[in-house]
Design a protein with these regions (language model features):
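The feature encodes a structural signal of leucine-rich repeats
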Residues: 1-3, 24-26, 47-49, 69-72, ...
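ATP-binding glycine-rich loop module of kinase domains
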Residues: 164-203
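Short beta-strand micro-motifs within the conserved protein kinase catalytic domain, predominantly
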Residues: 213-226
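Conserved short submotifs of the Hanks-type protein kinase catalytic core
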Residues: 223-237
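Activation segment signature within eukaryotic-like protein kinase domains
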Residues: 268-269
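Catalytic-loop of the protein kinase fold
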Residues: 276, 280-296
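C-lobe/activation-segment region of protein kinase-like
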Residues: 303, 308-360
Length: 384
């Protein structure tokens, strides 16, 4: 980059994805107004200590060759969102503990051997993905039924995400034809991690009324791609929220016309607490507990999915288990905050109690946040 690039004094957002940078440009450290920087899918190996300006709030370095972060990253006190998946990091600098505003961290698909307590104890960390590292796991992966790809006839595209594309498909068993959904994985590392880890987490999550039902897995041998076969989501379901914007950074955004009743809010809150309780009982942190991954209908019935950021953890490690559950509880607290913000009913005792629960979930001290067992208990009492 030009040595005088710093002359762009008002530049706030800079993306340079899919290029051939091998060193993070030092001159960017002199662009004082930079708020968001993205160097996804380059060949960056080195980040000079002076290259990270103090104003950074969102830094994307997914899919590079970075072996170490400079300790100077701890000076980025505004940092809220840090995307580091798909690099060669063996550890993180302890100075990152100074980034107390960090809310979302993606470190999947690296070479990290442990999650240090100073990292897990960050007061605002709510969304964490760390699968595909060298962390010791005492976990036997569940498996799903292998289905014959010849049973399926792919129809229209339903959606596309970082890890794969979802199609509507017809499934024929010789007698009847049923409609299903198939997610075909792209096979590359994403901003959240490896597709294999997503598949394993979805399978291990098990059956739950809120999870989109998993029917099995399928191999498309000709294309050398794999997929998961799921129940087709009924047409009356819609996305509760939309992913964060450049401005909102870590918080979902909502259509101006959306408004939920008290009943809908309580049903979604109950449903999400229940499924999170099951996941953590199985040693799984979802890592992306957001309204944009939730589908609801007019009755408040809820469906949840997208395990792209999910990670397994050792339930026998009491310290790690404690922190990872309380980190996800923080994310759940933000979800409650979102639900209350789009509720159209006037304040009543149930909503007041839900607001109190939100405040508990968002406390900076992990030990003072409730666990999901306690949250489910409180919500059950509210719904009675």
């Amino acid at each position: 980059m030009p040595d005088d690039f710093y002359r762009f004094k008002s530049l706030r957002i800079f993306f340079a994805s899919d290029n051939l940078f091998t060193t993070y440009p030092e001159v960017l450290g002199r662009c004082d107004a930079l708020d968001i920087v993205g160097f996804k899918s380059n060949n960056i190996k080195v980040i000079p200590a002076s290259a990270l300006n103090l104003n950074l709030r969102w830094l994307i370095l997914t899919g590079n060759k970075i072996e170490a972060l400079p300790p100077s990253i701890g000076n980025c006190k505004r940092m809220q969102k840090l995307m580091l998946a798909g690099n060669q990091l063996a550890s993180l600098p302890e100075t990152l503990a100074n980034c107390s505003n960090l809310s979302l961290l993606r470190i999947a698909a690296n070479r990290i051997t442990e999650l240090p307590e100073w990292l897990l104890g960050l007061p605002n960390l709510a969304w964490l993905a760390f699968s595909g590292n060298h962390i010791k796991q005492d976990f036997t992966f569940a498996d799903a039924q292998e289905l014959n790809f010849e049973q399926f006839n792919l129809k229209e595209l339903l959606g596309e995400g970082a890890s794969g594309t979802i199609y509507k498909a017809e499934r024929s068993n010789g007698e009847a034809i049923t409609n299903v959904a198939i997610k075909i994985f792209k096979g590359n590392v994403t901003s959240d991690g490896y597709p294999d880890d997503e598949m394993n987490a979805y399978i291990a999550a098990g059956s739950h009324p809120v999870l989109v039902g998993l029917l099995g897995k399928v191999n498309f041998s000709k294309e050398k791609k794999r997929g998961l076969v799921m129940n087709l989501i009924p047409e009356d379901f819609f996305n509760l929220g939309a992913p964060p914007s450049l401005e909102s950074c870590t918080r979902d955004i909502f259509n101006t016309g959306i408004g939920l009743s008290k009943l809908q809010v309580l049903k979604v809150a109950n449903s999400m607490a229940s499924v999170a309780q099951q996941l953590h009982a199985r040693g799984i942190i979802h890592g992306d507990l957001y309204a944009h991954n939730i589908l609801i209908n007019e009755n408040g019935d809820t469906l949840f999915g997208d395990f792209g950021a999910a990670s397994f953890y050792n339930k026998n490690n009491a310290v790690v288990s404690f922190y990872l559950e309380k980190i996800e509880v923080k994310a759940y607290g933000y979800l409650l905050d979102d639900l209350l913000s789009i509720c159209v009913e006037e304040e009543n005792p149930s909503l007041v109690e839900l607001a109190r629960l939100r405040d508990l979930c968002l406390l900076p001290q992990h030990a003072e946040r409730p666990g999901f067992d306690e949250i489910v208990e409180k919500l059950t009492a509210l719904s009675d």
